[in-house]
Amino acid sequence: MRLSALLALASKVTLPPHYRYGMSPPGSVADKRKNPPWIRRRPVVVEPISDEDWYLFCGDTVEILEGKDAGKQGKVVQVIRQRNWVVVGGLNTHYRYIGKTMDYRGTMIPSEAPLLHRQVKLVDPMDRKPTEIEWRFTEAGERVRVSTRSGRIIPKPEFPRADGIVPETWIDGPKDTSVEDALERTYVPCLKTLQEEVMEAMGIKETRKYKKVYWY
């Protein structure tokens, strides 16, 4: 198991009931500022969509159907399943100030606002137009997305993880630990202390005699 996977397991936080998901990851500083533990916010009603029926993933090319950027196409850079949100890179943006203090007005930066899954549609790679999709199975038994207009398969994109690694295209290098080496048992439990193990490995013999120790 890689270090990034271990860090991901360790970063899981226990969320309170009726937790309101947002753009910030759970447990981050911005999320704690918006969801303090002493405030109970109203639960948000979200349309239930199973993981099997969800069809939008990071890296997909979509077209926006509503809003000021309607008709524009872009790539999905973030998916928030708990709210059925998708974020399209560089589109549906608003500007906000960060780092504002009493003596400094802050820096204005663009920030993408999320869109509901019904406000975007996948782009058919054949004619570059928005299309409805449906899930089908290939002859090999693989479940794929198929355009209802052209019948073309829309494959899932290869999108990097938070650490920048694309698992499908990753090739182990000379400094990477293989799975076999990581799972190999090399540690032998022993009751000796570290000093005693070092002395045994270097052939050092202890000539001193231990004094009796009494515990009260």
UniProtKB/Swiss-Prot annotation:
Keyword Mitochondrion part of the UniProt annotation: yes
InterPro entries in UniProt: KOW, Rib_uL2_dom2, Ribosomal_uL24, Ribosomal_uL24_CS, Ribosomal_uL24_KOW, Translation_prot_SH3-like_sf
MF-aspect GO terms: RNA binding; structural constituent of ribosome
GO biological process, one term: translation
Pfam families: KOW (PF00467), ribosomal_L24 (PF17136)
Record protein name field: Large ribosomal subunit protein uL24m
Keywords: Mitochondrion, Phosphoprotein, Ribonucleoprotein, Ribosomal protein, Transit peptide
Alphabetized NCBIfam families for the sequence: rplX_bact
Start and end residues of each KOW domain: 56-89
Subunit details: Component of the mitochondrial large ribosomal subunit (mt-LSU). Mature mammalian 55S mitochondrial ribosomes consist of a small (28S) and a large (39S) subunit. The 28S small subunit contains a 12S ribosomal RNA (12S mt-rRNA) and 30 different proteins. The 39S large subunit contains a 16S rRNA (16S mt-rRNA), a copy of mitochondrial valine transfer RNA (mt-tRNA(Val)), which plays an integral structural role, and 52 different proteins.
Localization in the cell: Mitochondrion
GO cellular component: mitochondrial inner membrane; mitochondrial large ribosomal subunit; mitochondrion
Keyword field contains Phosphoprotein: yes
Disulfide bonds: none
Matches recorded under PROSITE patterns: RIBOSOMAL_L24
Major subcellular site: mitochondrion
Modification Phosphoserine, positions: S24
Stretches of the chain forming a coiled coil according to its record: none
Transit peptide: 1-9
Provenance organism: Homo sapiens (Human)
Family: Belongs to the universal ribosomal protein uL24 family.
Gene behind the chain: MRPL24
